[in-house]
Amino acid sequence: MSKKLLIKTWGCQMNEYDSSKMADLLNAANGYELTEEPEEADVLLLNTCSIREKAQEKVFHQLGRWKTLKDKKPGVVIGVGGCVATQEGDHIRERAPFVDVIFGPQTLHRLPEMIKQSQSEDAPVMDISFPEIEKFDSLPEPRAEGATAFVSIMEGCSKYCTYCVVPYTRGEEVSRPMDDVLYEIAQLAEQGVREVNLLGQNVNAYRGPTHDGEICSFAELLRLVASIDGIDRIRFTTSHPLEFTDDIIAVYEDTPELVSFLHLPVQSGSDRILTMMKRPHTGIEYKSIIRKLRKARPDIQISSDFIVGFPGESDKDFQDTMKLIKDVDFDMSFSFIFSPRPGTPAADYPCDLSEETKKERLYELQQQINAQAMRYSRLMLGTEQRVLVEGPSKKNLMELRARTENNRVVNFEGSADLIGQFVDVKITDVFANSLRGEIVRTEKDMDLRSVISPTQMMAKTRREDELGVATFTP
């Protein structure tokens, strides 16, 4: 009987990516198969996020539930990973001594070894160090699960915004070697992946070493990924205004695989608040980037992150944010009330704003962006949109669900053999959270670009033989 593994994931897309790699690692090393039933699991892993308020209490609440299972089934292994594990490792050991394994985002590759050690020594094991690129060197071959895939190209953050814990929990910025990234994406393309989402805390800060000792910029990487046959759509998240340079903007002019949608966090429209946040840009500088982007790609739509109620935020500061939202005409946002993160400078800033005022500001901001998003959706009515078919519709299994470049779900009638392919649809109806369409043409009638096959890309990419000697085919 196979061993069972349950992974509970909280947080960002990077955590989702990490959890998928944990599952692959434990399957390859020990034959663990995923389950959604805690009672079935031999290993219970919690991949945590420390961005939101009360993250630690949420972790201990979940661990309390799992302790009940461990009391009934003493052999079950409980592990805590992610950013809360890095921040609170010693506290977890003290408050939840029944936890067997504690690991950080940069040490998840050691999971099979750590689980085995905890079982053989009957003692907790903890590793929350930052071994830089070692994590990526130790991950298993990628496995495609559908037509879209996430690929982590860099880790960490070196910006140290005053409100953010990421530099303390994921370490400084470290970029994966260019060849490793391209090799992974080519493997995924061979397995049928059509869209890749490049991940990093500051993904456009990517500076990946190449086989010949040079450095590959993010703009260069985008063009190389776009050249792989089968990869016909590229997204990336999360980017930072500081590194959103003109060479990246130029890629939008000549690379159709790069979607006309960008998530570029600004956090506030007030220069005073941006300075307090230690954000290295002003509102005008942010708008300048957007103007250049829209010149290069007129139909591009922008989403952002916003923090309301930051310590010291005045009515004028908030109105500056609202003005920026209207000026840029954002299509979407992730917006939150400020919550102090332990260990960050902003946690010690005095704040005299009432909770009621913070909630009112958040509501006003979200209502404005929702109105802008609905206007964008209505503008799509009657237009043709190229969509990637993801699977059956969640509301009607007899229909298909697809996604537009600007991240909207479209439901339409079609046969199951279209799943994993691109189709052009005409938008016939607009709803609050989705669109409806009808097929205009299928992929066989499209002129999708072909440059280099996945097999050729893998052959060109640096590998090492069994002795660890690097090889490269130019």
Curated annotation (Swiss-Prot):
Domain of life: Bacteria
InterPro entries according to UniProt: Elp3/MiaA/NifB-like_rSAM, Methylthiotransferase, Methylthiotransferase_CS, Methylthiotransferase_N, Methylthiotransferase_N_sf, MiaB_methiolase, rSAM, rSAM_horseshoe
Keyword tRNA processing: yes
GO MF, any single term: 4 iron, 4 sulfur cluster binding
Binding site for [4Fe-4S] cluster 2: C157, C161, C164
Domain MTTase N-terminal, first and last residues per copy: 3-120
CDD domains: Radical_SAM
This protein's UniProt keywords: 4Fe-4S, Cytoplasm, Iron, Iron-sulfur, Metal-binding, S-adenosyl-L-methionine, Transferase, tRNA processing
Domain spans labelled TRAM: 378-441
Binding-site residues for [4Fe-4S] cluster 1, renumbered to this chain: C12, C49, C83
Essential cofactor(s): [4Fe-4S] cluster
PROSITE patterns xref list: MTTASE_N (PS51449), MTTASE_RADICAL (PS01278), RADICAL_SAM (PS51918), TRAM (PS50926)
Record's cofactor remark: Binds 2 [4Fe-4S] clusters. One cluster is coordinated with 3 cysteines and an exchangeable S-adenosyl-L-methionine.
Major location category of this protein: cytoplasm
A cellular component annotation (GO) from this entry: cytosol
Signal peptide range in chain numbering: none
Transmembrane segments: none
Enzyme class, spelled out: transferase
Keyword Metal-binding: yes
Family per record: Belongs to the methylthiotransferase family. MiaB subfamily.
PANTHER family noted in UniProt: CDK5 REGULATORY SUBUNIT-ASSOCIATED PROTEIN 1, MITOCHONDRIAL TRNA METHYLTHIOTRANSFERASE CDK5RAP1
Purpose: Catalyzes the methylthiolation of N6-(dimethylallyl)adenosine (i(6)A), leading to the formation of 2-methylthio-N6-(dimethylallyl)adenosine (ms(2)i(6)A) at position 37 in tRNAs that read codons beginning with uridine.
Subunit organization: Monomer.
Protein name: tRNA-2-methylthio-N(6)-dimethylallyladenosine synthase
Upper lineage: Bacteria, Pseudomonadati, Pseudomonadota, Gammaproteobacteria, Vibrionales
